[in-house]
Amino acid sequence: MHCPFCQHNDTRVIDSRVSEDGTTIRRRRECEACGERFSTLETIELKLPTVVKSDGGREAFDARKLRTSFDRALQKRPVAEEQIEAAVRAVVHQLRMSGEREVGSLRVGEYVMVELRKLDHVGYVRFASVYRSFQDVADFREEIEKLERELPVGSEQLPLLEAALERAGKPGKR
């Protein structure tokens, strides 16, 4: 690597550290010619697929747009920054793992909805309303009812319900 101070070709690594998330290596280097020290960052370069828009246009994947989508959906919601970042990373990971050169914007939207659903149901419905082009209140109601039907019942709830039914003289559902 060239020294940024004297442009000499020979530098040596004197220290290397891996970032907390394991995706970056920080290397401390020293120039063999002038003795100056500088740091470099080494990251994995993985090409993300090109996004094919609904109108047929193509554009490079932009993680900032993805983050903006999450931020808008979760605006003023009690979701930590770390959770949002993890959701963005999960979507990017899905795109990388697809192995495809192109991916439709609808699929990206589906990945976002999966992550939003895990984070915050209000944010999920906000995003779904734009993503699925809700036309009226009935569309909102339908999505909310679908979400409620698919929500898991707490593991402690069923035994309590069965016990209450048995106390009332009605057999439980076993």
Curated annotation (Swiss-Prot):
Transmembrane segments: none annotated. Its cofactor is Zn(2+). Keywords: ATP-binding, DNA-binding, Metal-binding, Nucleotide-binding, Repressor, Transcription, Transcription regulation, Zinc, Zinc-finger. The keyword Acyltransferase does not apply. GO terms for molecular function: ATP binding; DNA binding; zinc ion binding. A zinc finger (unnamed) spans 3-34. HAMAP family: NrdR. Negatively regulates transcription of bacterial ribonucleotide reductase nrd genes and operons by binding to NrdR-boxes. This is Transcriptional repressor NrdR. The gene is nrdR.
